Structures are given as C-alpha cells and as structure tokens.
Swiss-Prot record:
Keywords: ATP-binding, Chaperone, Cytoplasm, Isomerase, Nucleotide-binding. Together with its co-chaperonin GroES, plays an essential role in assisting protein folding. The GroEL-GroES system forms a nano-cage that allows encapsulation of the non-native substrate proteins and provides a physical environment optimized to promote and accelerate protein folding. It is an enzyme of class 5 (isomerase). The gene is groEL3. It catalyses: ATP + H2O + a folded polypeptide = ADP + phosphate + an unfolded polypeptide. Belongs to the chaperonin (HSP60) family. Its main location: cytoplasm. This is Chaperonin GroEL 3. GO terms for molecular function: ATP binding; ATP-dependent protein folding chaperone; isomerase activity; unfolded protein binding. It comes from Bradyrhizobium sp. (strain BTAi1 / ATCC BAA-1182). SUPFAM superfamilies: GroEL apical domain-like, GroEL equatorial domain-like, GroEL-intermediate domain like. One of its GO terms (biological process) is protein refolding.
Length: 540
C-alpha cells in the first residue's frame, strides 16, 4: 500500500479552499449575460471556447492533491446541478465558493462546524420555501422563449426555436440537439410516433420520387412473431381487401413465401400493403409493440395472450390517419387509440422512469414516453466554424434544460435577484445558539454573491448595485446586466427557472457544509522519481 500524506484542521481547510478558489474563479467569469469566455486546450483539434460553467469545471484537475480535493468537491456541485436542473451550474459554483469562504472564517474563529452546518441547513430550507412561494407558473410561449434566451446568453434565435419545439411536441416530447452541416440553425419536428425500422422490401414503395411508402387511413396488424407463410392470414387479408383500406404489417420479420406473396399482390394492385420489422429487441420490443397497439387502438397479436393469426378480425387491427415509411424510419401519424388508454400508458411509463436506476433505461423510457405523448423535435445548430457550432450547441443544451425546468416548477426574476430578496426571510429563522445564527448569516452573505458577480462581469460595481436593490422592496425589481438598467426583470424577460435557482442553492450548501466540517485530508504521497541508470557505453 502506498504511503499517505495526512493534513489536519486549518492546514487541511486552507489547502482545500485554495483548490475551491482556483476552480470557482475560472468558472465564475462565465456568469450572466456579459459573462466572458473560457478557452480550453484540447489534446487534439482546435481549443474549445465555452461559457458553460460545468464544461469548465470538468476540465480542471490540479497538481496539488489536497487542493484538487477541494476543486473536485466543487466540481461535484456543478455536475449535480447540471444533472438535476440542466443549468445554473455557474451560480451553484459561485454560491459554494462563498459559503465555504465564509464558513472557513467562522471555523477559524473557533465556532462549532456542526452548529454552523445546522444553521446553513435551516437558512436553505427557509429560502427554498420562499422561492417556491414566489415562483410563477409559465403560461405563454413568449415566456418559454424568454427563459431559453436568458439561458443561451441572450441568443433570441435559440429561445425562439426552443419555444417552437416545445409548442409542437409538448412538454413531455423529446427535443434533441445536433450539429448542423450548414450555417443556419433549423428545427425539424417529427409528429406522431416514429421508430427506426424501414420497409422490408423496396417493392412496397408508393412514392417512387421520394422512395417512401405512404398509406392513408390504413389498418395496422401488430404481430410479435415472424411471418413466413400467409395461409393463416388469408381470411384477414380478404377482409382488408373488401374494406378497401391499406394494410401495414409490423412483425418481428416478414420473409420467404409471405414476403413474396405480399409483394406480388402489391405489384398487381390488388392490395395496398407494406411491412416493417418491429422496433427494439427482447423485452423492449414487446413493450414498444404494446405502445404502438395502444396508440393505434389495436391489439398485439401474441401467443402469450392466446390469440392465433387465423382468428384475427378487423376490429383487432390498429388504425391511423397516415403512415409514412422510408428506408430507415416508420412514422405513424394520428393513431386512433383511446385518449384514456394512451394517458394510462404514459402514466405507467412515468412511474417506470422514476423507479429505474439505469441511465440507459431512463433514456429509452423517455423516448417511448415522447413517442406516445406527441413527437420528437430536432434542433440542428449551425455556425461558420466547428468551434462556433460546438459553443452554440453547449448553449442550446443549457437553454433546453432551463426551459424544461421552468415549465416544471415555474419562473422567478433572474439576475440573482430571487436569492437576494430571500435575505428578508432569514430574519425569521429560529436558531438554538449563536453558532447556528452564524450559519444563517453565512447564507445571508452568500446569496448576495451571484448578483455581485453578474454585475462585476458586466463591468459595474457589485456592492453599489446590491445596496441600491435592497433599498427597494418590489420583488422582481432588479439590475438588467444586459442593458445596464434598473427595471422590473420579469416584465423585461430576465427570468430564471425556479428549479434551477433552488437546485443551485441546495447543492452548493450541501457540498460546502461538508467542506466546512472537514477536519482531516488523506492523499497518496507523491512518488519520488527514481534516478535513471546511464546506458552502457557502446565502444565496440
């Protein structure tokens, strides 16, 4: 086992604090609408330019192991906030730095770290309750666009695209962000349910110009096994022909005689038909087939349920307004499933999302939920250079998470004002002793720091602005760093999602409390470099 280096009390906290400062000082310059860029060297390719706090935090690794511990714990604040709220990482880092700094001073002055922590927890609970009480639910598309714009560092175009995407696919819909091949940013919306399986044979194509199958008002047969012969299906096919409607077959596979017969019938014009393979694999395939059945109002033809293909009637088939199939994807638009069944299914998937511990499973469940709830939107981010595209994509990702958070828990005035206004609530917090009161005061000073930093990054005097803001009682009145004016921030569109502000404060206080109550640090001792032996002489 390698020898360890151990540091105690003040020495340990000082080392950690240095690491906290290095990381937080690099991150906090990105805060606010006038936040500066940070350039990160990459071992290959062009350097990366970003204004995203968590991206900067993840790149920082310090040589001194004790300093690095402090830096990594604050990095954890940024990562946790990014995971939970998707934005607010820089605010969380700035808050953590402020709480640790103030806390370290109090501990050095001889106060009890555990009582300080209790005081911090009491203050945070009071502020969270205040934030929830003041949060305003989002009602209009404009407000969604404003949240997106603020999170994207004032980029109106990004805010507009996000609002449009959320309007089209709903709050539960999947919105993905990709890099575009062109200069322009564009939005593509796939309405209805889309899955990544194309037609089994190109002979099914009805639109030869676009090489795709288009079926209007079709019946949909959902079968979980392979189809290799059509003998058992003949009664059903005859009923479909008589109805005059097209038929889509979704099965594990369609092969051999079955495929040949279907293609021949299609080419002769007797039967408008197409076949696709079922999406997914294993248990996920069963679940996705059931989703399609519920969406279209049909029944999954499965031997588990005791339904044989020869007994299937038209009433067991699903219906949709339109189905479009190309080489790679199938899209079912406007399925005829009962609304209450679809809602029950989405509720069931939501419960599974809450219970699952696997990130991969969660992602797949969210995709299924979105397909049932209304569709998928893709925002393709354009730019003149690869560096610019990557930087914009970072901002779009941030903005997307922020808008989702805003829809979830409502909005608050931005610019750090919501936290600043919460100082009043702290006057009513009851503490058991002087050290706990000092913990409350640590938070009182820390929640002023985001406003100061935003103002400082905009080139103004932070203390002056904070003093001016505290003179006035109006909750949403604040300093708009983008324009340099004092105004009602909610009316001006300077807003933050309540979830982002709340998560940033809770995560910062949680990790900062741990740093304050740390009494010893243990790290591996650096190994001394062994002297290399001289190479033997080569005088042959």
């Amino acid at each position: 086992m390698a020898a360890k280096d151990v540091k105690f009390s003040t020495d340990a906290r000082d080392r950690m604090l240095r690491g906290v400062d290095i990381l937080a000082n690099a991150v906090k310059v990105t805060l606010g609408p006038k936040g500066r860029n940070v350039v990160i060297e990459k071992s290959f390719g062009a350097p990366r330019i970003t204004k995203d706090g968590v991206t900067v935090a993840k790149e920082i690794e310090l040589e001194d192991k004790f300093e690095n511990m402090g830096a990594q714990m604050v990095r954890e604040v940024a990562s946790k906030t990014a995971d939970l709220a998707g934005d607010g990482t820089t605010t969380a880092t700035v808050l953590a730095q402020a709480i640790v700094k103030e806390g370290a001073k109090s501990v050095a002055a001889g106060m009890n770290p555990m009582d300080l922590k209790r005081g911090i927890d009491l203050a945070v609970d009071a502020i969270v309750a205040d934030l929830k009480a003041h949060a305003k639910k989002i009602t209009s598309n404009d407000e969604i666009a404003q949240v997106g714009t603020i999170s994207a560092n004032g980029d109106n175009e990004i805010g507009r695209f996000l609002a449009e995407a959320m309007q089209k696919v709903g709050n539960e819909g999947v919105i993905t962000v990709e890099e575009a091949k062109s200069l322009d940013t564009e939005l593509e919306v796939v309405e209805g349910m889309q899955f990544d399986r194309g037609y089994v044979s190109p002979y099914f194509v009805t639109n030869s110009e676009k090489m795709r199958v288009e079926l209007e008002d079709p019946y949909i047969l959902i079968h979980e096994k392979k189809l290799s012969g059509l003998q058992t299906m003949l009664p059903l096919l005859e009923a479909v022909v008589q109805s005059g409607k097209p038929l889509l077959i979704v099965a594990e596979d369609v092969e051999g005689e079955a495929l040949a017969t279907l293609v021949v019938n299609k080419l002769r014009g007797g039967l408008k038909i197409a076949a696709v393979k079922a999406p997914g694999f294993g248990d996920r395939r069963k679940a996705m087939l059931e989703d399609i059945a519920i969406l279209t109002g049909g029944t999954t033809i499965s031997e588990d349920l005791g339904i044989k293909l020869e007994n299937v009637t038209l009433s067991m088939l699903g219906r949709a307004k339109k189905v479009v199939i190309d080489k790679e994807n199938t899209t079912i638009v406007d399925g005829a499933g009962a609304k209450k069944d679809i809602e029950a299914r989405t509720q069931q998937i939501k419960l599974q999302i809450e219970e699952t511990t696997s990130d991969y499973d969660r992602e797949k469940l969210q995709e299924r939920l979105a397909k049932l709830a209304g569709g998928v939107a893709v925002i393709r981010v354009g730019g003149a250079t690869e560096v610019e595209v990557k930087e914009r994509k970072d901002r779009v990702d941030d903005a997307l998470h922020a808008t989702r958070a805003a829809v979830e828990e409502g909005i608050l005035p931005g610019g750090g004002v919501a936290l600043l206004r919460a100082t009043k609530v702290l006057d009513g917090v009851k503490t058991a002793n002087a050290d706990q009161k000092a913990g409350v005061d640590i938070i009182r000073r820390a929640i002023q720091v985001p406003v100061r930093q935003i103002v400082q990054n905009a080139g103004e005097d932070g203390s002056l602005v904070v003093g001016k803001l505290l003179e006035k009682d109006t909750y949403s009145w604040g300093f708009n760093a983008a324009t340099g004016e004092y105004q009602d921030l909610v009316q001006a569109g300077v807003i933050d999602p309540a979830k982002v502000v709340r998560t940033a404060l809770q995560d910062a206080a949680s990790v900062a409390s741990l740093l304050i109550t740390t009494e010893a640090l243990v790290a591996d001792k650096p190994k001394k470099a062994e002297a290399t032996q001289a190479a033997p002489a080569m005088d042959f």
